[in-house]
Amino acid sequence: MTDTAASSPTRAAGTSWLGWLEGKLSWILLGLVGLLLPLLDDSYIGVIAQRAYIYWVLSAGLNLVVGYAGQIAIGWVSMLTLGAYTTAALAAGRIGPEWNPYLALAAGGVMGAIFGVIVGLPALRLRTFYFAMTTLGFATIVTQVALAWKDVTGGGVGTPGPTFSWPFEPGWGFYYFCFILAALATWVTANIGSSRYGRALVAIRDAEVAAEASGIAKPKLLIMVFLLAGALGGVAGGLFASLQSYITPDAFTFEMSVLFFIAILIGGRGSILGPALGTIILTALPEFAAPLVQWSTFLYAALLLLIVLLIPGGIADLLDFKNRRPLEQHREIAPRKELLSRALDKTDGRHGIVLKDIALHFGGVRAIDGLDLEIRSGEVHGLIGPNGSGKTTTLNVISGYYKPKAGTLTLDGADLPFDRPHLRANYRIARTFQTPRVVGAASVLENVMIGGTVHGQATFTEALLSLPRNRRDEKLLRAAAMQALATVGLESLADVRADRLQHSELRFMEIARALMLRPAFLMLDEPAAGLSPEEIRRLGDLIKAISREGTGVLLVEHHADLIFDICDRVTVLNLGKMLAAGTPNEIRSHREVVSAYLGA
């Protein structure tokens, strides 16, 4: 990413002080309540608030796992258990000499981080409910170890929790300690959520294939998130042990584990404010509905059902006033091709992707059968053929999603690796998809910024602490994304949620996201599908302008007129084999092509 992008005068709407206040108002109110609550001098309410803040610390980290990354971690109570027993055992001197409670709390966080990664590793391979069962199984194991390891945990009898000294001694001092740690947990997770790492997590959750095409490496990112979530869970456990004064395995119930998970869903997954509100509600509810304690499980289930049915986006959706504003009905997409020189790196010389004798079979079906194809820089290469002829499969081979049984794939004579699609971004190979792959709950601007994830320089830790290099990354990514949106004609919709766009706008938004890679080669999979004739004409002009900047374009399309109008060369596939290749005029008059595809 270059500094040129940052100098673009275009900026997202809604960045005035009023927009800033609208986004921060809920946090300001929560902060004021937290700071002023001790003035009530009600110890009962103080204990409830302390428990809410402790759960908030855990939920802040769990929100990155469940809300952002979309991993169903139901058994995250295990991190609370590990942190509680580690802190309590070290502070009580059950493992060597007695530790200072503050150091013991830090050790609880480290223990949570270690086991957070261990528990998270299966998520790299397991999906949805299989991973959920893994987390529940681990929580059961931790509880059984706590029962059996009597020398350290006290077994079923339990062990005393740590007592923190000045300035956070029991009472309102400890209240402020919990409040400060909840605020810190919220700050660091909000920093991650608003960084390229947070956008990458949401892309993995809602559009994993597009995330890979944007160069996002899922395993490394998930490990870092599980480490952070585990650490926060461990710290919450240490605080919980102190609040309880005495802990036993019975304190860490299945209902508590479900409570944390439900808090994320009720509050609104993928938001920072939502899970905090969800945690507060679910912590306070049992206290103020004590006569109905035997119905607690039923009430949790009913509340979750109501939220899912009535406000599936959670409480955070109710507070998203900006995206309730009506949009103009008759919107026009007007690309500005003159901006492409800033959005792309001019390619000098001749470069090419070459497929040689590629073969790919699915069982007995020959999806690609001995295909030869060359995509040259500065040219638009059309790929046409009947449905099932292997067009999209060819794009998937080039993009690294499929590994062929035979043949070679080279870029400028060097082999391209198969089965690692996220590495294609390193070669500046970008693509769009037959069905737009977008993050509906994110803004148009955020969706496009996902495409530039690989250009960021800040580490996960720098994003966590919002250090200068991370802030610079965000400034450059935002400017580049606004420039890409202006190029395709969507800059006025930058702050609109992507799921509010028309189909044609999603098509152009995908192209803007692909432009964020400053691609040397661009693969377009039926970009004209669902577009009006005028939109198709503008799309064709944009694609041709992209190729004139030196980018090689492979265009898979069923609109023959578009192919013949803008392509320099055309390849026709039929049943996985190349039926013909040549200029548009040659293909238009090819007898077999006319018979098999174009019609008489």
Regions found by a protein language model. Name each.
Residues 399:
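Helix-to-loop junction immediately C-terminal to a conserved catalytic motif
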Residues 518:
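Conserved catalytic motifs of ABC-family nucleotide-binding domains
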Residues 2-337:
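Transmembrane alpha-helices and adjacent helix-loop boundaries
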Residues 522-526:
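Catalytic Walker B motif of ABC-type/P-loop ATPase nucleotide-binding domains
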Residues 353-355, 368:
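Conserved structural motif at the start of ABC-family nucleotide-binding domains
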